[in-house]
Amino acid sequence: MDLLSGTYIFAVLLACVVFHSGAQEKNYTIREEMPENVLIGDLLKDLNLSLIPNKSLTTAMQFKLVYKTGDVPLIRIEEDTGEIFTTGARIDREKLCAGIPRDEHCFYEVEVAILPDEIFRLVKIRFLIEDINDNAPLFPATVINISIPENSAINSKYTLPAAVDPDVGINGVQNYELIKSQNIFGLDVIETPEGDKMPQLIVQKELDREEKDTYVMKVKVEDGGFPQRSSTAILQVSVTDTNDNHPVFKETEIEVSIPENAPVGTSVTQLHATDADIGENAKIHFSFSNLVSNIARRLFHLNATTGLITIKEPLDREETPNHKLLVLASDGGLMPARAMVLVNVTDVNDNVPSIDIRYIVNPVNDTVVLSENIPLNTKIALITVTDKDADHNGRVTCFTDHEIPFRLRPVFSNQFLLETAAYLDYESTKEYAIKLLAADAGKPPLNQSAMLFIKVKDENDNAPVFTQSFVTVSIPENNSPGIQLTKVSAMDADSGPNAKINYLLGPDAPPEFSLDCRTGMLTVVKKLDREKEDKYLFTILAKDNGVPPLTSNVTVFVSIIDQNDNSPVFTHNEYNFYVPENLPRHGTVGLITVTDPDYGDNSAVTLSILDENDDFTIDSQTGVIRPNISFDREKQESYTFYVKAEDGGRVSRSSSAKVTINVVDVNDNKPVFIVPPSNCSYELVLPSTNPGTVVFQVIAVDNDTGMNAEVRYSIVGGNTRDLFAIDQETGNITLMEKCDVTDLGLHRVLVKANDLGQPDSLFSVVIVNLFVNESVTNATLINELVRKSTEAPVTPNTEIADVSSPTSDYVKILVAAVAGTITVVVVIFITAVVRCRQAPHLKAAQKNKQNSEWATPNPENRQMIMMKKKKKKKKHSPKNLLLNFVTIEETKADDVDSDGNRVTLDLPIDLEEQTMGKYNWVTTPTTFKPDSPDLARHYKSASPQPAFQIQPETPLNSKHHIIQELPLDNTFVACDSISKCSSSSSDPYSVSDCGYPVTTFEVPVSVHTRPPMKEVVRSCTPMKESTTMEIWIHPQPQRKSEGKVAGKSQRRVTFHLPEGSQESSSDGGLGDHDAGSLTSTSHGLPLGYPQEEYFDRATPSNRTEGDGNSDPESTFIPGLKKAAEITVQPTVEEASDNCTQECLIYGHSDACWMPASLDHSSSSQAQASALCHSPPLSQASTQHHSPRVTQTIALCHSPPVTQTIALCHSPPPIQVSALHHSPPLVQATALHHSPPSAQASALCYSPPLAQAAAISHSSPLPQVIALHRSQAQSSVSLQQGWVQGADGLCSVDQGVQGSATSQFYTMSERLHPSDDSIKVIPLTTFTPRQQARPSRGDSPIMEEHPL
C-alpha cells in the first residue's frame, strides 16, 4: 500500500505542472496483462487543457502518439479526445522489466504530441506497471539432493536451495513446507539481507546411517498472491559418516570491482578456506551455490580447488552492472562453508549513442512530406538519443551536420524535437536529407548518426512574374483599328498546374484595347484621339492555375502621338474688359487666354491683333493687352477689335475672338445738391403737421456712375432736438415729433450727401432752413432771418470728418502750453493799449446801439471785405473769429509811396453774442438767398466791373510775410446791400444767382501761378502783439507787345490781426471744398460750424466758443466796436429825413442817403476790411487748411451787420490807423474807389465752386459787376453805370452776358498735389462794347486777359 500511495502522489504532482510549458510529464498506473481497449486516462482533462487561452487554430486540436518506427505500442490514444486505451499487445511486466532489479518499479514510457503548432505540447506519459500473480515459485531443480552426517545434532539446520518467483512483492515466494517428512526432519524459512526467503532443513531426531541412509520427501513452496500459486520438489537426504570439522572461509563477504572491458580469464578474486581435519576430510572443494544466477555462472568461472574466480565471458555493465556470487566450501562433509562475492562491473565507454526517431508527422516510405507553406516551428519528429554507458559516458548530445531550415530543440533528457526553423521553399530546395549526429561525453567520445529524409511539397505560393516591370508603347492618333502594340510575358516559379499562366486585361483597361489570354498580345481595337485622351495607363494581369490561383500585374503606358488636327480655342468667344479711365498708357488691360488641344509645336499659339489696330498691343505669348493710348470715357466709352490665335503646326490652324474694352468711370465727382438750390432757401412747416409727415426732400445728384453715383443722406448738424429725421436713400426729411410753442421759428438742418464711391467717398453738405410757423406774412423778413441764420454756426450732432487722434507727444503738449501762456500775456497787453486809445469812441458807439439789435448803414458805406483762406488740414478751429485791424493801401505804378491812396482803419469785430448763446451777427459772414426780390429792389446802386477768375491758392513767399495776388477762383461780387448777392458775403452753400446785364469790356488781370501747398510744421512760438496781413490785387502789367499802358495802380489791403486771433486756423464761413486741398480726413465745414469738433486745435489755448469767451482778447472787442459805431452814426442822422421804415430795418437806399462827394485822394474816406480767416495764414494755408475754405475780403456796413466795418463819409471822417507788424502777412488786392461811391468787395464761394465778385457804387448810376460761378458754368452780369477805379471812373453802357468754362479738379489732385501749378480753365472772353474814362487818364481799364 505504501508503494501505491507514493505512486499516486507522484502522479498528482506531475499533473500540477503548468500546461503551457514546452514539455510535460504525465504518469498513469496500469496492471500487467490488461485486456485490450481498457481506458487508462484522458489527457484533455488530466492535463487541464481547458486552461489554455482561446486561440484561433489552423486545425483542430490533435493528440498524436509518438513512437519508434517498427515498435508495437502497448497503448493507443484518441487523436481528437486525448483518451488513452490499451491495445491487443500483452503487457508482461516480467518481460518489460527483466533487467531491472526486483526492488525497482517497472515503467513503460511513451510520448504524445499535442497539435497544431499554435498549441504544440510534447507530453511524456509514464505507465507504472503493477505486478500480478501470474507466475508460480519454482525450485531450481525438481529433485534436491542433500547429505547430512549421521552424527548431526538435533535441531541442526541445513540450507536448501531456494525457489524463484518472477513476481515481486506479495506475489513472490512467501512460504516453504515439507511434505511427508516422517517427523525426522523439519523446515525453517529465514530471510536474507536482500529480502530473499531461504528454506533450512532441521534435524529433529538422531540419524543412524546403518539403520537408514536415505530419506525422500517433498518440499513445497508458496507465494502470497491471489490466487496463491505453489510448486514442489523432491528432497532426497543422504546420511553420511561423521565429519568432525567444517571448512571455514577466511572472508565471508568480498566485494570487488572490475571494468566491463576486462578480458576473459582475468582474475576477479580468490577465496581462501581452511579445514582442521586431515586427510581426505581436510580437502576443500569450492562451488557456486544453486542461488547464483545463470548469468553469473555464465560470466564467471570458479576454480573448485583453488577458489579462484575468473572471467569466463566478456562482461557487459549495461546488461548486468553487478553480480552476487554465493560460493560454498565443502570438505566432503554435510556442513559446507558459505562466502558471498559481490562483483561490481564498472562502466567503460564501450557503447555508442543510439538515435531513436519517433515521427510526429507520419512518414511515407520513411520520408516525411512537408508542404512548403507550413508555418515556422512545425514539429516533425521526436529524436531520442541514448547511451548505455553511465555518467559522462552516457551523456549524449544530438545535432545536425550542416545548416538546414530545421533545428533540434531539447525537451527532455536526451530527447529533442526536430522542427522547422525557416520557411520552406519548394522552388529553392525540393528535398532534404538530414543527418542527425549523437555523441557521448566519453573519452574518447563515441558518436552515432542517423538519416532523416524530408520531401517538400510544392504549393501555389508564387505568383506569375512579368519579364518587364513597366511596359511603354507609343502610337499616333487617328490609327487604324486592329494594330498590334506589344506582347507581354510572365513566368511562374511553381511547378505543374501552378505554373500555367493565363493573361487578361485589368479592370482599369479601356475598351480601346484587347489582349490574347494565351500569348499576351496587346491590340488596339478602336481609333484613338489624343485630344480626348493623350495617354492610357492600365494594367495587364497574369493568373496561374493553382488553388487558389495567384495573380500579378504589370502597368502598361500607351502614349498617343499628337497630330495637328485642332485649331486654337479661345476661352471665350468674346472678351469684355473694364478699365478705369485713369489707366496709364501701356498699363495692363486684361489677359487673353487661348488653348490648343494639340501638343508641342501644334499647340504653340501666337496671338496678334487683326486690322492693324495701333491703339492696343497684345503680347504674342502671354496674351496681355496693353493700351497705346490714354483713355477718356467722355470721348470714347469702349473699344472693339479682334485677336487672332495661330498654332505652330506644320500646317498651321488659327481662330479669332472679339475683344471689347469698356472704360469705367472713377469716383471724381461729389454729390451736388439740386434741392435746395442754396442755403438761403427755406421751407414752411406748420406747427399742426403730424409726426411722420415728410416736410421737405433734399435731392443731390452725382455725375459719376454706378456705386460712385449712389447718394446717401444724413443729418449732421442743426437738429439738436432730433425734431427731424431724414431717409438716407430718398432724402425725405420727416417730422418726428409734434411741434410745440418752443419749436416755433427757424430750424437750420445741416444735411450731408455722400456717395458710395471707392476708395474714398465724396460728400457735400447743405443747410435746409425749416421755418416752423402758421404762415409766412413777410417773405422779406423771413429771407433776412434766413440770411442772418446762415451767418451763425450750426450746432453739430454727428461727425462728418475724421478727428485726429487725441494722443500726442508730451513735448508738443508742453510747447503748446508755453505758447498759449505767452499768447495770453501778449493779448492782454495789446488789449489794454488799444482800449486806452479808443475809449472815447467806444463809449459813444455803445450809447447809439442800446435801442436796436442791428442796423443797416447807407449803401455808400456798405462795404465789406471778406476773405476765406483755404487750409489743407487744421486742428480744433474755434467757431469765433477775431479780426481787429484792416489797412487798405492803394499804390500806383508811378507813385508807390502815395499817402493819399493809403487809408488805415481800425476795425473792431465782436465774435460772440452776449445773449443766450447766440452768435453775434457782426462776427459771422452772412449769406442771403439769391432770390430776394424785395431787397434787390431796395438797393439798386451798383457799378459794373469786369468779371475775372483767380487762382484758388495763395503762394507762400516766406513764413511770416505773404504778398498774394488773388487767384482766379476767388472772384469779387459787388451787389446791392441786400440783393441776390449779399454785400457781406456770397452764399457759401448754394449756387449764386447774381446776374445782371453788363457792358462789354476787357479785363486785364494779373495771373500768378504758384506751386502746390506743402505741409509746413507750424511753429509753436508765440506771435507778436499783432500780425499784419496784406492781400494784394493788382492789374496785370501790359505786355511788351501791347505797349499801351505804362503803369497800373495797385491796391494793398493790410490786415492787422492780434495774437489772440491766431487761435483759429479756419475761416468763419461755409466755404466750398477747395479742389486743391481736399483730403479724405479733413473737410471744410459750413458757416459758423464748430470746427473744434473735427480738427485739432492749432493754438495753445483750449478754449472754445462754448466757453462763453473763446478769444482771450474778447475784452478788447467792445472798445473797437464802439469806435466803429461812432463813425457811422453821423451819417445815419444826416440822412434820416429821407429814410423809410424799411430803410431802418434793411438799410438805406439811394433815395435817402446822398452824402457829399469826397475827393478821390481825401483821407476822410473810411475803408473797412473784414478778414474771416484766423492768422497766421501763411501757416494755416499749408498746415491747417480745411477743404474749400473761401477767402473773402469785404467792405461792409456798420454794425450790427455781420462782420462789417462802417465807412463814414460825412465829416469829420474817422480814420483809424492800423498797427503794422512784421510778417506773416496775408496780402490781397481789392478794387478801391474813392467816395462818394460805396465800395464793396465780396467773394461768394458756395459749393460747388460758386464764386462771385461785386463792386457796388452809389452815384451817378448803380453799377454792378458780378461773377457767378456754379458747378459747370459761370455768368457775368454788368449794369450800365460808372465804374470808379483807383485813378478814375469808367463808363459802361450796356451789359453782355457770357458763359465761362467750368473748372474741375480731380480727387487725386486734391489728395496728392503735384509739383505743377494748378491748371485753370480760362473764362470766356468778353469784348468791351463801350468804354469811358470820366476823369483820370491813368485809371486802369479791365481788359480781356488770355490765360
Swiss-Prot record:
Residues 1-23 form the signal peptide. Glycans are attached at residues 27, 48, 54, 344, 553, 773. The keyword Repeat applies. It comes from Homo sapiens. Residues 24-812 are extracellular. Keywords: Calcium, Cell adhesion, Cell membrane, Glycoprotein, Membrane, Repeat, Signal, Transmembrane, Transmembrane helix. Changing residue 42 to G: In a colorectal cancer sample; somatic mutation. GO terms for molecular function: calcium ion binding. It is found in: Cell membrane. This is Protocadherin-11 X-linked. Residues 834-1347 are cytoplasmic. Residues 1057-1091, 1097-1116, 1326-1347 are annotated as: Disordered. It is a single-pass type I membrane protein. One of its GO terms (biological process) is cell adhesion. Gene3D superfamilies: Cadherins.
